[in-house]
Amino acid sequence: AAAPEWRDLRPHRRARVLYRIGDLIEEHADDLAALQTADTGKTLAETRALALSAAGTFRYTAAALETAEEAITPSRGPYLTMSTYEAIGVVGAINPWNSPIASDAQKVAPALGGGNAVLLKPAEWTPLVSLAFGRLVHRVLAEEGLPTALLAVLPGKGRVVGDAIVRHPLVGRIGFTGGTATGRAIARAAADKLVPASLELGGKSPTIVREDADLEQALAGVMYGIFSSSGQSCIAGSRLFVHRSLYDSFVGELVERVRELRVGPGTDPGTQVAPLVHHAHRDAVA
C-alpha cells in the first residue's frame, strides 16, 4: 500500500510536490531529451517537446488537486451523504517505447496525485529516460521527507516484469499503453483480480480532406500526422482520404513535399525524419 505519510497528505500538499517535480523535469529537459533521442532515435526537437509535455502534465495534475472537491448529496433525511476520494494503494503503469517520458508522466502524475504508490515499467527498448525521470521524482520526494519507494521504475521484459506487476495481488489498478493483444491479456488478468484497468491500445487514424479544406493547413497536418516520430505512433495518420475533386493535385503536392524531407540522425538539428526505434522495424519497412 502507499505510505500513510503520502496517502494522508491533504491534496494541496501533494500538489506542491507535483509542481516541484514538473519544475525539475523542465530544468532537466535537455538532458532528458538527449537520453530519449539516444533510446528512441527521435529528433531532439521532438524529445525536448515531450519532456516539456511531461512537466506540463505534473503541473496540470497539481492544479486539479488544488481545486478538487468532494460532493455532498442533498439530504433526504436526518443524515449526511457525501462522496470522498480514497487512494487505491499501488498502481501499475506499463508504457510503450515511442514516447516514454510523456507516457510516464501521464500515468505517474495522476496516480501519485491520488495518494498512491506507482510501479512503472518502461518498454524494454527504451528504459533510459524513464530511469532518469524516476531519479528526478526520487529527488523531490527525498527533499520533502517522503519515501522514494512511492515510485519504483522496473525495466525488463514485458512477459516477466509486466506480467508480475499485472498479477500481483497488491496492485489495485493497472494502466497500460501498447498493443491490442497485450491489452486483452491485461484486461483478462485485471478481471480475474477484480481491479480496474485503463487501456490505451493501437488503432488506425484516418485523415479526411474535404472539398472545402484549407489545403495548406491540410498538407501540413498530413505531413506532421504521419512523419512525426517517424510514423511510430498509435495516433499517426496512417490512412488518407481526399475528396476526388482535390485528389490529383493534393497527392501530387504531398509527394513532392515527402521527397524533400531530410532523413538523418535524431541528434542533427536539420533532421526531419529520424531513425526507427529498432532494427526489426527497419527491416519490416525495408
Please tell me what each predicted stretch does.
Residues 1-68:
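Glycine-rich loop-to-alpha-helix module at the N-terminal edge of alpha/beta enzyme cores
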Residues 5, 23-30, 41, 63-66, ...:
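Generic secondary-structure signature for well-ordered alpha-helical cores
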Residues 6, 24, 43, 99-100, ...:
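Glycine-/small-residue-rich active-site loops that bind phosphorylated ligands and cofactors
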Residues 15-22, 33, 51, 55, ...:
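Hydrophobic face of alpha-helices
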Residues 35-43, 72-78, 268-274:
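Short linear capping/connector segments at secondary-structure termini
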Residues 37, 70-217:
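Rossmann-like NAD(P) dinucleotide-binding subdomain of oxidoreductase/dehydrogenase enzymes
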Residues 181-286:
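ALDH superfamily catalytic-core signature
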